[in-house]
Amino acid sequence: MNKLIDEITKSQLNPDVPSFRPGDTVRVHAKVVEGTRERIQLFEGVVIKRRGAGISETFTVRKISNGVGVERTFPVHTPRIAKLEVIRRGKVRRAKLYYLRNLRGKAARIKEIR
């Protein structure tokens, strides 16, 4: 039974996901359905967490929009993500970057890996 679940799960995984970690700046091209129309919505920000494994793996992206912090959680292997681009690699020493919620302006910057 376990092998069957593993095979089904493996067939649902998206092989086109680039490697990314917390601290990286990513641009997510998410498919949004509005009525009968479907369009692509961009969401660019810093990955503040990545959790889970396999088909249930998710990541959270944080950005500042009009002075307000916005966080959005995406499943890694969802067909609703048309494309996932890594814009820059960040150097952090934590797996969960919740401390960024309390920082403003230049204090919230993350060093880039060269």
From Swiss-Prot:
Record-linked InterPro entries: Ribosomal_bL19 (IPR001857), Ribosomal_bL19_CS (IPR018257), Ribosomal_bL19_sf (IPR038657), Translation_prot_SH3-like_sf (IPR008991)
Cross-referenced Gene3D superfamilies: 2.30.30.790
Source organism, top-level taxon: Bacteria
Swiss-Prot/TrEMBL keywords: Ribonucleoprotein, Ribosomal protein
Gene Ontology cellular component list: cytosolic large ribosomal subunit
A GO biological process held by the record: translation
Gene Ontology MF term list: structural constituent of ribosome
A Pfam family per the record: Ribosomal_L19
Family to which the UniProt record says this protein belongs: Belongs to the bacterial ribosomal protein bL19 family.
Function comment: This protein is located at the 30S-50S ribosomal subunit interface and may play a role in the structure and function of the aminoacyl-tRNA binding site.
Protein name according to UniProt: Large ribosomal subunit protein bL19
Annotated organism of origin: Listeria innocua serovar 6a (strain ATCC BAA-680 / CLIP 11262)
